Amino acid sequence: MPTMKILTEGELRQIVPLDLDAVKCTEDAFRALAVPNAVKMPPILRLDVPDSRGEVDVKTAYIPGLGGFAIKISPGFFDNPKIGLPSTNGMMVLLSSQTGLVQALLLDNGYLTDVRTAAAGAVAAKHLSQQDASVATIFGAGVQARLQLRALTLVRPIRQARIWARDQLKAEALVEQLKLEHSFAISASDDPRQAVSGAHIVVTTTPADRPILVASWLEAGQHVTAMGSDAEHKNELDPAAIARADVYVADSLTQTRRLGELHHAIEAGLIARDAAFPELGEVIAGVKTGRTRESDITIADLTGTGVQDTAIATLAFQRAEERSAGSLFES
């Protein structure tokens, strides 16, 4: 009978921390996207449940060379906190690329998505920010804000961080958390423009539906990673920022034209709908250029891709096998 491995969130937290291995597997996944006609990644399936302020995204991708591929179900029900439940959860199923049989059921409640999303921020900063970037500004005060800062420390010599959020109390609470994790200076800002001034890297991690980062605030040499715009209605960057940037890079141009910050610049008439831009995987692979000057303003528009899910699920399964983690289930 077919046997699968079942891993809980607690087990996955122990074996898949946000570390350099998570960054590398994410980087390799993006690089695979640069190989013509190799990766198979269908469009994101999205189901809206408006009566409950809910949405469900399903992502998947097949990457040649990996033994399995993941299918991720990622719900977000944003009224849940009112009844004492988390707003997001989810799970991944890893299937064999050879037989299609289920290899693992990863009951991560969104944890692996958090890790791979933060790892993507590290990959973007590694390939697009100044190599000596040391001052980071994070917009947002949730889990991803905390993880994005940790991810940046894996690839850049961060020595100072600023946190801005629309809820100042949440920003201050996050700063107190972060001070326990990092030894460098971390402060909460009550002015987003001041938070951006002098920063080398700016990461936006919010579900905003109107711009929170204004184009005129951007300074020469800065890198911006926009993480939050993974649906048509979400928008963190002033559309003019895309037009102003010296370098704009998408995780998937097909997706960012429909979901990301690029989508809003197109709708505003600032960017042609068929304008060509490099994808992050192409920059990693060296087939397209990213930053070429220290003074370049660079923007990475990350909407989240199925290759990231397959990559992190594969890493989780490998580590579970190595450490005999999880439970075996015969179907």
UniProtKB/Swiss-Prot annotation:
Molecular-function GO terms, alphabetical: lyase activity
GO cellular component: cytoplasm
Enzyme Commission number: 4.3.1.-
EC primary class: lyase
Record field: transmembrane: none
Keyword set, alphabetical order: Lyase, NAD, Plasmid
Pfam families from the UniProt entry: OCD_Mu_crystall
InterPro entries: Ectoine_EutC, NAD(P)-bd_dom_sf, ODC_Mu_crystall, ODC_N
Family of the protein in this entry: Belongs to the ornithine cyclodeaminase/mu-crystallin family.
Name under which the protein is recorded: Uncharacterized cyclodeaminase y4tK
Organism of derivation: Sinorhizobium fredii (strain NBRC 101917 / NGR234)
Lineage of source species: Bacteria, Pseudomonadati, Pseudomonadota, Alphaproteobacteria, Hyphomicrobiales
